[in-house]
C-alpha cells in the first residue's frame, strides 16, 4: 500500500480547523505536519479534510435488494451497489440495519441469514468498513435462540430492540398501509392477518425474551440500541439492561431522559434535510439545537449525513466541528470504535476531501477508506510526491 501525503487542506482537528499536512501510511494516519517518505501527494488546496462518516443505522440497501415490492435482486449485487453509494457519499464505516421480523419476505429469517452471510463473505472486497446491525423485532420470539447463537459467535456488530407491533395492528385498518405490508411480506391478506394474531397472542412472553437476549449481548460485548422509545420510563428500563443508545426517541421528554442518563441518542439525517420527520414525530433539527441529539444516521438515504451536517451549519444551529461530530466522532464513540472519527496520528485513515464552496451542497472530491484512495473526482490533484514540504493553503 502506497504512502500518501495530503497537503494544503483545512483539516478538522477536534473543534477547530488547521492548515496541516496529513500523512497516511498503510491503513492509518502516521503523522500530522511532519516530514514523510510519501510516494503520492494530494493537493487539497481549497478543500476541507474531514474524518470519514460513521453511519450506525442505514437500511437504504433494502432498496437495492427489493427496489419494488416482489422484485428481488441478488444480495451480492445489492451490497456492491450499496457500498458504492455509501463511499461516494462519504460513509467509510457503514452498519447495515437489517430487520429480522416475524414477517416473511424482505424482513424474514431467511433474508437476515442470507444478508449476514453475504456481508461476511464480501467484507474483504467492500470499500467501506461494513458491519451488521441486527434490528430484532421483539415479538419475533422464534428468533431468540439463533440471535443468541450469533451474538456468542461474534457475528452481530450492533443489536437493536424494535417493536412495531402496535403500528402494524393499527395499520390493518388502513387499506393502503395494509396492502404495503402484505406486499412486503409476500403472503395473502388472510395469511398476514393470521400471522399478526399469532404474534399478538404471545406478547406476554416478550419482556423475558428481551432480558435474555440483552444478557447474552452484554456478555458478548455487543452495543445495544432501543428503537422508538416513547416514554422516559421505557428508556430507563432499557438502560438498566445496558442498552446505551436511544434510536429515534419519538418525543422530547424521552430524548431528554436519555441524554440526562448518559445515553446516546440517534435521529435521522433525512429528518434534518426535510425539515421534519416523514412520520410526523420529533423534528431532528430541534433536538440538535436543544442538545438532545448525539448522532445523525443515514436512515434510508445515504447522502443525508453529509448534507445534514452542512445544513445545520448554514442554519446557524451548530458550527461545522460540532455538526461533524454528529456523523463521525459521536457514532464512533457510541459503538466503541476508538480508532476512527477523528484525524490524529494512529487513527484509522478514513478521510474525506470536501469542496464546500456551495455551503448547503458540499461536494466530495476524494474518499480515503482504511488508507486506500477509493473515490476521486479530479485526478490532477493526485501527484507523485516530491519534496516533503507542505503546500500553502489557498
Segment roles from a protein language model:
Residues 261-271, 275-356:
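His/Asp/Glu-enriched, well-ordered alpha-helical/loop segment
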Amino acid at each position: 500500500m502506497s504512502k500518501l501525503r495530503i497537503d494544503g487542506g483545512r483539516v478538522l482537528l477536534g473543534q477547530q480547523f488547521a492548515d496541516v499536512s496529513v500523512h497516511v501510511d498503510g491503513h492509518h494516519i502516521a503523522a500530522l505536519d511532519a516530514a514523510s517518505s510519501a510516494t503520492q501527494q494530494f493537493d487539497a488546496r481549497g478543500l476541507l479534510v474531514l474524518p470519514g462518516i460513521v453511519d450506525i443505522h442505514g437500511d437504504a440497501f433494502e432498496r437495492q435488494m427489493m427496489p419494488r415490492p416482489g422484485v428481488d435482486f441478488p444480495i451480492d449485487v445489492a451490497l456492491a451497489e450499496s457500498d458504492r453509494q455509501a463511499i461516494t457519499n462519504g460513509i467509510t464505516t457503514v452498519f447495515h440495519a437489517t430487520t429480522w421480523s416475524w414477517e416473511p419476505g424482505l424482513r424474514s429469517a431467511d433474508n437476515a441469514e442470507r444478508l449476514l452471510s453475504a456481508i461476511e463473505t464480501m467484507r474483504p472486497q467492500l470499500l467501506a468498513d461494513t458491519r451488521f446491525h441486527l434490528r430484532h423485532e421483539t415479538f419475533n420470539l422464534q428468533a431468540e435462540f439463533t440471535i443468541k447463537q450469533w451474538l456468542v459467535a461474534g457475528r452481530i456488530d450492533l443489536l437493536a430492540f424494535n417493536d412495531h407491533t402496535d403500528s402494524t395492528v393499527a395499520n390493518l385498518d388502513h387499506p393502503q398501509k395494509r396492502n404495503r405490508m402484505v406486499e412486503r411480506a409476500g403472503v395473502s391478506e388472510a395469511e398476514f392477518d393470521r400471522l399478526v394474531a399469532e404474534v399478538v397472542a404471545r406478547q406476554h412472553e416478550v419482556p423475558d425474551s428481551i432480558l435474555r437476549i440483552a444478557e447474552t449481548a452484554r456478555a458478548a460485548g455487543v452495543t445495544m440500541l432501543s428503537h422508538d422509545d416513547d416514554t422516559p420510563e421505557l428508556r430507563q428500563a432499557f438502560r438498566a439492561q445496558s442498552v446505551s443508545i436511544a434510536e429515534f426517541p419519538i418525543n422530547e421528554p424521552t430524548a431528554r431522559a436519555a441524554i440526562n442518563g448518559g445515553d446516546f441518542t440517534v435521529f435521522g439525517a433525512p429528518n434534518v434535510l426535510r425539515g421534519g420527520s416523514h412520520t410526523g414525530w420529533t423534528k431532528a433539527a430541534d433536538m440538535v439545537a436543544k442538545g438532545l441529539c448525539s448522532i445523525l444516521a443515514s436512515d434510508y438515504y445515504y447522502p443525508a449525513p453529509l448534507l445534514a451536517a452542512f445544513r445545520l451549519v448554514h442554519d446557524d444551529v451548530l458550527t461545522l466541528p460540532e455538526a461533524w461530530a454528529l456523523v463521525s466522532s459521536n457514532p464512533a464513540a457510541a459503538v466503541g470504535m476508538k480508532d476512527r472519527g477523528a484525524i490524529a496520528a494512529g487513527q484509522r485513515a478514513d478521510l474525506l476531501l470536501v469542496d464546500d464552496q456551495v455551503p448547503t451542497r458540499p461536494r466530495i472530491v476524494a474518499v480515503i477508506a482504511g488508507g486506500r484512495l477509493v473515490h476521486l473526482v479530479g485526478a490532477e490533484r493526485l501527484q507523485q510526491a516530491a519534496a516533503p514540504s507542505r503546500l500553502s493553503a489557498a
